[in-house]
């Protein structure tokens, strides 16, 4: 048994020995799905609902079920967007994968679903303190285990890597439309930040404004242009670009692979060495 297996067993037991309405905050590449399967094997549910934000995550669940010979016939998959179809249904356990990505409307739907269900497990590897606070307040879910990237690297569970941060000022010239406002991305970011700061002083919820502000960064023209510059600089190097949204991935002028891609074999071709550059979203 590897240390990864031991840690997965520990976190599975933490959930089982809790009130079973909690969140596991386990770093990317650790094995959140396999930890969940260990929970299933112990509590032996007859029905499972797994909510996911995009199809690639659903495919990851199915791949691990197949590899570990877990009977997936008892599992119902649903996207975060379609959770509303399950408000009046009961399951032995409900998994909300990437729970930090729930929208305000989806959180309201979860409130209804949770009224009829006793075992809830939220999974995340990217949870800010603000989102954690919101999920606790709105859904009464607590983080009962955290396993950081730093700890996983220290223990040799995942491979170490180097991060180089390149700061890019937001564009303050090009007008863009943000709902009914026409302004630069910098002015939109500043406007949202002003409201967020004001609400924080009043101790009010700012999670969804923060998500809107994050989308400004994800869709940033300045960041897009800087990425194009870097791709030219490393034109002979193998580069994989992780993007927050499909629109940006498609505008990088390189092959892109995401849930809306028509060519499903693109990433496999890149993985075996074809081409130098590729953009992906939520790989």
Question: Where on the chain are the PLM-derived regions?
Answer:
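Conserved helicase ATPase core of P-loop NTP-dependent helicases/translocases
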Residues: 59-63, 238-242, 247-283
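Walker A/P-loop
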Residues: 19-39
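Conserved RecA-like ASCE ATPase "motif II neighborhood" in helicase/translocase motors
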Residues: 74-112, 281-283
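Interdomain linker/hinge connecting the two RecA-like lobes of the SF2 helicase core
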Residues: 20-23, 145, 149-238, 243-244
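Post-DEXD/H (motif II) to motif III coupling segment of the RecA-like Helicase ATP-binding lobe
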Residues: 101-162
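Conserved pre-motif I regulatory segment
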Residues: 1-24
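P-loop (Walker A) phosphate-binding loop of NTP-binding proteins
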Residues: 27-28, 53, 244
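Inter-Walker segment of RecA-like/P-loop motor cores
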Residues: 51-90
């Amino acid at each position: 048994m590897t240390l990864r297996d031991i840690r997965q067993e520990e976190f599975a037991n933490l959930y089982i020995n809790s009130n079973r309405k909690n969140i596991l905050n386990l770093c990317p590449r650790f094995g959140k799905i396999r930890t969940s399967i260990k929970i299933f094997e112990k509590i032996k549910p007859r029905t499972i609902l797994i909510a996911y934000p995009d199809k690639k995550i659903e495919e990851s669940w199915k791949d691990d079920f197949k590899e570990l010979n877990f009977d997936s016939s008892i599992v119902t998959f649903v996207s975060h967007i379609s959770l509303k179809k399950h408000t009046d249904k009961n399951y032995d356990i409900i998994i909300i994968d990437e729970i930090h990505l729930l929208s305000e409307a989806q959180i309201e739907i979860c409130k209804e679903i949770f009224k009829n269900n006793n075992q809830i497990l939220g999974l995340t590897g990217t949870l800010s303190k603000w989102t954690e606070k919101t999920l606790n307040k709105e859904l009464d879910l607590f983080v009962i285990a955290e396993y950081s990237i730093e700890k996983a690297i220290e223990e040799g569970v995942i491979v170490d890597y180097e991060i180089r941060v390149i700061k890019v000022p937001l564009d303050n010239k090009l007008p863009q439309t943000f709902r009914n406002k026409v302004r630069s991305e910098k002015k939109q970011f500043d406007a949202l930040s002003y409201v967020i700061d004001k609400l924080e002083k009043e101790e009010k919820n700012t999670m969804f404004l923060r998500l809107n502000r994050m989308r400004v960064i994800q869709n940033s023209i300045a960041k897009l242009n800087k990425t194009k510059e870097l791709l030219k600089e490393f034109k002979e190097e193998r580069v994989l670009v992780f993007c927050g949204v499909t629109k940006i991935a498609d505008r990088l002028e390189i092959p892109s692979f995401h849930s809306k891609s028509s060519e499903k074999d693109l990433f496999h071709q890149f993985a075996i060495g074809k081409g130098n550059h590729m953009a992906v979203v939520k790989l």
